[in-house]
Amino acid sequence: MTLINHNKGKEQATATASYPTANYPTANYPTDSIDWLTRLIAFDTVSRHSNLALIEDVQAYCEQLGLTVDLTFNDVKNKANLFVTVPAGANADDVNHGLVLSGHTDVVPVDGQEWTSEPFTATIRGDKLYGRGACDMKGFIACALTLLPQAVKLSNAGQLRRPLHLALSFDEEVGCLGAP
């Protein structure tokens, strides 16, 4: 990944980074939201394709944090929803209620669209990051994944007052088919 100086008034920088999905999951996970977003954009999760590579990568990350992941699959088992809970710290058995961070993993197709950069490679031009799903909704997922270790730390210290849930679904772009 190319490091970029985002200071205003400096020369505009352009950087690209991609992660080959064949090498996932991996033990080397990002620690900031831009690197997470770069990683997530590299997964081609257009609604007509499987989202399993992305889901399995997030699953391995969550399990590395000591969390239990529940997956629910579509009928043909090529797409999955992911649900994970960080329990309330004071009562590790308390997984009810709390806050759900919910997002979808699929993106709309790029067919017939003119891109000035590869849509499944995060590209930073100036102070903007471009890539399919950057705003809808892999950016949100990147932020949630970046903060997940902090929630686990708070839970382990007995300081997370309510459970925190992360729910990732498939096929929102084609009628919310993956939403329970």
Residues covered by each model-derived region:
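Acidic/His- and Gly-rich active-site-bordering loop/insert found
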Residues: 2-15, 19-20, 24-134, 153-160, ...
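Acidic/histidine-rich catalytic neighborhood of metal-dependent amide-processing enzymes
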Residues: 137-180
